[in-house]
């Protein structure tokens, strides 16, 4: 059956309980992309570049040809935020024009009501507010550190800001895998929490996953139409429209990662 039904109802495959869904959200979603951003998307180019393979480092940068790497990586981190908060939020790079340095912490950045009642954040905060605080702090710190890399990333691979962003993302990844997942298993593994976990899984699917992919589908339809229009009527204007829509379509794609 469809993913939404399988995940919410735990009817087949790896999802045999509400807890298995929460584990999937933490490890396969949140940890996986935090680790990928820190250990691959930033570290791979950095390692190649600083070892002397400058061309290899350049070509290892994701989206280097569009100068969109920083926003792609930041949207990856915002996908973790959406998963943890149980809600898609409009506090993204376009809203603040990439100026995350204007915010001292997530407390300045977040709006009231950003965190859904049925969310991982609310659940963890109910028993361990310090851990919830650490997670929220590192999510925002990772996004802020990425945006602090001088633009474009391809020209600043070996900058101290790149190293800081890489390390912060890896700190977030380590927290999610080595502290958050074990804590959730130990604290909420009893069947008495099944209803709470099930509500979080449903909120995640209905308010994060499905809207993200709906947005992705709609924006890719517009992109395809623009590409076909350029193919049929080549012009600078039609080429620019297709390029801009490609950039627009990347946002929900990168925000789908967690």
Where are these regions (language model features)?
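Mature extracytoplasmic or organellar-lumen-exposed domains after removal of signal/transit peptides
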Residues: 1-258
């Amino acid at each position: 059956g469809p993913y939404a039904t399988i995940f919410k109802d735990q009817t087949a495959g790896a999802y045999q309980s509400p807890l298995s869904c929460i584990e999937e959200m933490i490890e396969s979603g949140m940890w996986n992309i935090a680790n990928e951003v820190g250990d691959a998307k930033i570290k791979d180019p950095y390692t190649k570049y600083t070892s002397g393979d400058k061309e290899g480092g350049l070509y290892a940068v994701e989206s280097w040809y569009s100068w969109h790497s920083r926003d792609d990586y930041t949207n990856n981190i915002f996908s973790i935020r959406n998963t943890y908060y149980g809600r898609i939020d409009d506090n993204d790079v376009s809203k603040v024009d990439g100026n995350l340095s204007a915010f001292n912490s997530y407390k300045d950045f977040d709006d009231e009501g950003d965190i859904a009642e049925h969310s991982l954040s609310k659940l963890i905060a109910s028993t361990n507010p310090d851990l919830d605080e650490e997670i929220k702090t590192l999510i925002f710190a990772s996004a802020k550190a990425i945006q602090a890399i001088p633009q474009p990333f391809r020209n600043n691979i070996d900058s101290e800001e790149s190293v800081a962003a890489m390390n912060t993302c890896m700190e977030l990844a380590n927290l999610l895998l080595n502290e958050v997942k074990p804590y959730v298993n130990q604290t909420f593994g009893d069947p008495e929490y099944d209803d709470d976990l099930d509500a979080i899984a449903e909120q995640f699917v209905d308010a994060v996953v499905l809207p993200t992919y709906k947005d992705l589908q709609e924006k890719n339809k517009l992109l395809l139409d623009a590409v076909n229009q350029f193919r049929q009527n080549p012009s600078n204007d039609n080429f620019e429209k297709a390029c801009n829509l490609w950039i627009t379509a990347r946002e929900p794609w990168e925000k789908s990662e967690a």
